[in-house]
């Protein structure tokens, strides 16, 4: 909400009487900024809003989401997400800065239907206004942890994103009962997150080390960032020699020993790519992207990629790195697996 408020303040300075519907839609769809809050702020400043444009963009967005939605194969479950997204909008992700947060339960799902409550022993899904839990994406698995209200404890076993930025917490209620509207405390498994951050940052260093050792034709084709290992798929036509593997490991470990800062910036995709950031998979990016860099800017970053994952603050937090296997998974695509101490 803080970022959305800043954007709204900047846009208000540019207008005379009416805020463009495109701005209100971006605030709602990208930052989870409620429309009624935008309206209240505008009203207090005697300003209006282009509601027609906002609602047209909402309609177009819903139609596009339904067109592109692959779903689970269960139409009754899939339809739920559209109804929830229409009602509550996007979930605000706090996990880049926080390991825990307070939130409000906006929706509960039990037995593939929306429910007003969960009782002890129930398995279900929970959606809140905000969360520090990272949802599985970009190869990085989701966080685990707990969501609680006093002695009422919901154990999170998985977290996925639906329809863009709707964070769905899967799990079971271990004790007590909870209901829609409850204020709760969200806590991720900090040790597990620390391992995920280290492996994700190691993946970036591995990617750049592969490119520097094998050639610039190396491009990421897939990855798995788990709390106990990493797997990296990339374009390359032949097996990596033992000498090349030693060089790759040395490059990664040298950068770990340098303990250089890991920085993140928010930029437009065009500006990021002009700065040398790598983008992958032919992905479609929004108006703003998160750029993760390792190294010193004045000396040219060692690694710069577009990435929405979580990362260490300094490369020294990664620990010793070692590739443990390589294999061919398709024509022209190889896989490397690695561990860290």
Predicted regions and their residues:
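A glycine- and charged-residue-rich anion-binding loop/surface
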Residues: 1-341
